[in-house]
Amino acid sequence: MTEFRRFQTEKSKDIKDYPFLLPKCYDTIKVPRVLSTMSETADVQVLRSVSNWSSLINHTEDSIQQAYLSLIANSRHCIYIENQFFVSMINSNEVNNEICRVLCDRIKRAYYENEVFRVYILLPLLPGFEGDVGAPGGSALQAVLHWTFLSLSRGPNSLIGNLKKLVPDPMKYIKVCSLRTWDILCGKLVTELIYIHCKCMIVDDKYTIIGSANINDRSQCGNRDSEVCIVVKDTEFVASKMNGRPYQAGKFALSLRRHLMQEHLGMLPEQAARLGGRPAPNIDLDDPVIDSFFFDTWGAIAKKNTQIYEEVFRVYPTDMVESFDELKAWQSQMPMSEYSPQLAEEQLRQLTGSLVEFPLNFLLKANLAPGLASKEGLVPTSVFT
């Protein structure tokens, strides 16, 4: 509504066909009885990223970022993040949002205080931009990859790079994963990444942020893209577990995290056809912190699935490729899906869901930043951050 009013004030204030919109009042609406048995109560707050240019307010509001920072800093057990982008750096002059810094501080605190603490991050395997990696038309795609890797694992301003200075094994606390699927198309085995477009964070199975905001400056700083989210604080609780101990989890946050993990691990009823007659995996999802789930289930399944896809399709991005020359050599070899499709399908039937590892070492030795002579190199870096 504020966007419409801004447009109306600037562009069409004298056109009577576009009247001011007034907020509706819903005080008199009765919730149908059937819905009352299907829903839970919760405290919900609307969050925004807006400023003068987007909503004609006299200040910059970054309540979305502030909610992220507060929930991360005050988390006790577990953070689950799914997002389309992850561009956030520590002590950077080019990226200003502080999500990465607060994540790093929270993991450091867990290390110093000997806490069992987990962070799950799910991102698309590749950004949703035109072109192919290593091709002339793929500069925009590579630019986003460049900033993603600088944020996660490469260089002194990255999350994992900072953690390695103090924490012997940062991956004890973090799992960065993605999603991939396969099918038979026109009699041929094919694969494609599942593009994660979700923007949510679930903290301690009690707090949830859902909305339109990506993890980057464009969405978080308030003075750029306008965004809206909600933060949900559960007020109804159910018995669950954290690190093997009894725990009161929020009904909504727990059910959302469980459903997302069920989907990624192939546990939903509609995913049974993928199993080739095997029973659906029976995995206890209540405790996301305990070692047996974090390492032996989530991490092990992601690793096994990644290995199968690499063997069957020679997919990329992959940690097996650290330079553009290695990428060409990797792609030049015939995949199992072509020289032995029957064996390949047998291998694919051993997959568990769609979870795969995010390849943090992909093109590690290559420069993914756009060339200065390219159109991507001529625009401000803020376009990609």
Task: Annotate each language-model stretch with its function.
Residues 1-385:
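Charged, low-complexity intrinsically disordered terminal segments
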